[in-house]
């Protein structure tokens, strides 16, 4: 005799192997199998789908299903698998849902994903750079002086673009007095 869990698993497997399932239905089925205790590898083995397809579908299952359905039904939007795979580049599922929600087109998804990736890299690099400068004795400039940077009252000794990787070594010229970053 098989357990209730095994019965549900068999029914899910039979349904997933139907050819008329949508990507969203496959995603939900894979998620249910995962919830029942199967691993991604086991799901791939049982269904005959590749591991990468299973992983992609499970990422689709993490999205806001109502918003996803709304975008799929919008004839002007034309949501593609490529768009959904593009969203996977964002680790934070809430941010994926926000991008999906705000996007006005397929191209807009790609643009928003790229912007988010760039912004995340800048934040990460800023954090690394601040830590490195602090260890070097460079302090954050007081807020009241922040605008002076733009009117020539400060001597800029180095500029670092946060879209680039933070250099391993930062060489600062010898200066009299405290150095600040902004």
Model segments located where?
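Amphipathic, charge-rich alpha-helical segments that serve as recognition/docking helices
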Residues: 2-104
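Extended aliphatic helical segments
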Residues: 8, 54, 93, 110-113, ...
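Extended amphipathic alpha-helical segments with heptad-repeat/coiled-coil character used for oligomerization
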Residues: 89-124, 136
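C-terminal helical accessory/scaffold domains
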Residues: 118-182
């Amino acid at each position: 005799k098989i357990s209730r869990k095994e019965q549900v698993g068999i029914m899910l497997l039979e349904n997933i192997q139907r050819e008329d399932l949508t990507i969203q239905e496959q995603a939900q089925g894979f998620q249910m199998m995962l919830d029942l205790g199967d691993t991604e590898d086991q799901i791939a083995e049982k269904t005959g789908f590749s591991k990468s397809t299973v992983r992609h579908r499970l990422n689709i299952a993490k999205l806001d299903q109502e918003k996803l359905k709304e975008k799929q039904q919008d004839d002007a939007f034309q949501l593609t698998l490529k768009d959904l795979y593009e969203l996977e580049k964002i680790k934070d599922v809430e941010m994926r849902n926000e991008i999906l929600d705000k996007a006005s087109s397929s191209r807009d998804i790609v643009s928003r994903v790229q912007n988010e990736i760039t912004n995340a890299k800048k934040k990460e690099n800023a954090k690394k750079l601040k830590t490195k400068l602090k260890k070097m004795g460079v302090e954050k400039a007081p807020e009241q002086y922040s605008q002076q940077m733009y009117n020539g009252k400060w001597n800029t000794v180095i500029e670092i673009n946060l879209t680039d990787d933070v250099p391993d070594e930062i060489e600062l010229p010898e200066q009299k007095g405290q150095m600040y970053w902004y």
